[in-house]
Amino acid sequence: MNTLFNGKSAAMMLALSLMNVSAAFAQDDNANAKEEGNRNVMLNAASANGPREIQIGLPSADVNVLENGLPVTYATNPHSVNTIWRGDASLSHQGLLKIAETAITTGNIGYAVNSFTQKGQKGFNGTLNYKSNHFGLQEFSLNMNGDLGNDWYYSVNMYQDFDPGTFKIKSTPYQDRTQIYKALITKKYNGNRGEFTAMYKYANSHNVYNYATQSAPFIYVGDGSVKEYGKFKLGTTSYLPIDNEMTYRNMRTGKLEQTSLYDACLNKASEVTLMNSYRFDNGLNWKATLKYDHSRGAMVYQTPMSISDLKSADNQGVYNYMYRDIDGQTKAYDGQYIQTRMSCLNAGKIDEALFTTELTKKFRTSTFRLGMNEWFYHIDYCSNTTMYDQSVPADGSYALRVWDANQRDSYFYDFNKNASEYYKGSENKLALYFTHDWDVTNKLNLYYGARLEWQSLNGENAAVKNAQGNYVGRFADYHLGATAADGTKITPADLSYNWLNYDFSVAATYKLTDNFGFTGDFTYIVQHPKFETFAPATLPNVNKISVPLGRAGIYYNNSWLSLTSLFSYISKTNNNATLNLQHGSEIKAAPMTYDIQTWGWTTDAVAHPFKGFDFHFLFTYQKPTYKKYETSITFNDGYVGNINATGNIVAEIPQILIELDPSYMITKDIKLWTSFRYFSKTYANINEAYYFNGHWETFGGVNWQVNKRLALSCTVVNFLNQTGAKGSIAGAELITKDEAKGIKNQIMTGSYLRPFTVEFTASLKL
């Protein structure tokens, strides 16, 4: 996404490392299996249409979902995972790769959802899934597969999503309209030793929810709590203006153009995947997967900026806001508040060719694997940004776009001034890796591996310098071919980089007794910036990025309890970010590089105290902190905005996390379950000035296996019906602790908890 958000996403990812690090040992005697369980990855309190983000204490890596061993998308901006992948009936398997496995096979650190497409099987088989909720969601997923004779097999899939969201918006009846189609043909050969599959996938998605649910107004009380602003209901009232049209200046051509927000967020993908596997007589197994994807990726943001109180003493006579009524007549706006928003229209044409091949050999006490990645990614990307102002209605009605007649005669202004982006070119990664999973004795298991990667980046961006050697930066009506105030012409600047990346991982488990033992692992990654980091109007820090992760602890297993307790450390150097700092009505970009580190302790337990009852418990204490987080910028009125967050707790990240997951089999066919997640106090800006109190995310439901073909379930999201804000507060980066002490009962905007939702699902085996 735009670099406006990069610092925020880095902060959001920094500290939840310990929440998930121990699950592998707590749930599986084979501590070095590639996947781990009990992560409830599809229980997402932030979204109804994708897997939850499992945070590991660092900025999110792009490769967070794999299908058939390859990334669903090489880069998630502008082509997000949810627009081309869903956890639907087309998948034969979904799991969660461990951190070490993700690091070795993809070069990124973090968990990755690991999925495989359903291939054809003997006879005729089918699955029809249906999902709905009380807001009107209609989701259908169908897989049909079978054999054609002579070892030929087929599989076809269809996914349709009609999701109106949790509130109505004027621009479209759906906040998510996604359709995905897959068709596979498989041939088994040489006595079933080999298997070749060709797959075609087409996806078409409008991810309106990305901007529709981005923010909402509330009253910040001052003690970490919030209350509703008038009749505006968080999560069930729209904060989008009625008007769906957006005027922008094309970053490539400089022309003023118009589009609808719905059209701007169109994502399309056309993919061909070839998969082959073969089992040799000597026990050697070979597999290879090649994917080509031609797509249009798009992400739209409507980012809230400053809020102005038009009726305050300081603003009397300063503004003259107008709007147009339903008849097109110009009228004076007499509301109390207006909010400035920045529209970011991110889009790019993408071609990617991804190839992975592996050789695996099992020995009596170990398994050895040798693999290779050849991943090529080409993109022509830009982000067109536009500023506009809107009303902040207290009566729960739809917001109106307004304009200040003292300054302009139309809604839109400052085209491409604040967060516009451009880059074009290719990135290539060629990597070799190996892993060895070795039972040294019946008490000691070792897992180790390494990856060597050559990263090549070639293309152009708009990081233009003037005659003095300083970056020109963005300005109003900025675009390729524009001329800055100092006479510098904005022409694409060439980019060419070649880097050697590497990582290694080692894990050990020692069984002191049959039930008790020690476990630990260490993963170290050296990376360099990805192509998307070059999107802003300045070059990023291109020094190496180091990511060490170390964990050590104990485990205990018996017939009814599996328990692990671990201490952990994780850090990352040279995070690139751009803060869009606000002072009055002015917004300025401040590029920076900083480090993050997290220490913590976690205990994870899975218990089966009596027949039919299971209980999962997770407790984490952690301290995520910023390092070298300093920047400053001078505004036009001479005010200097300084930020020094070094040593501060990372914004938006709790220090205490708790997960409670009880379930009970009422009968052999009916399961009752709940899931509770507690997140303690979080800071809402990097200066620790604003904060939100802790909250619970809750889920519960009943699963009923009616017969061997039909399964029904009912799930309640947020059954405690907690409402409130979370994340960060718009435009608050420069607010200090001392300034915040006097701020009480003030209107602000930010993200919010997913509202109470009742979901119904049915799955039919055909």
Regions found by a protein language model. Name each.
Residues M19, Q27-G123:
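Acidic, small-polar-rich N-terminal luminal/periplasmic segments of exported/outer-membrane proteins
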Residues P164, Y626, A651-Q705, L720-K737:
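C-terminal beta-barrel architecture of Gram-negative outer-membrane proteins
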Residues T76, A89-G95, T102-A183, Y189-F196, ...:
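Outer-membrane beta-barrel translocator/receptor signature
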Residues P173, T186, E195-T273, A298-C344, ...:
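Acidic/polar loop-and-plug regions of large Gram-negative outer-membrane beta-barrel proteins
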Residues N442, W560-S562, L566-T578, A589-I686, ...:
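Gram-negative outer-membrane beta-barrel transporters
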Residues R252-Y301, I338-S383, N416-N445, A493-K511, ...:
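Outer-membrane beta-barrel transmembrane strands
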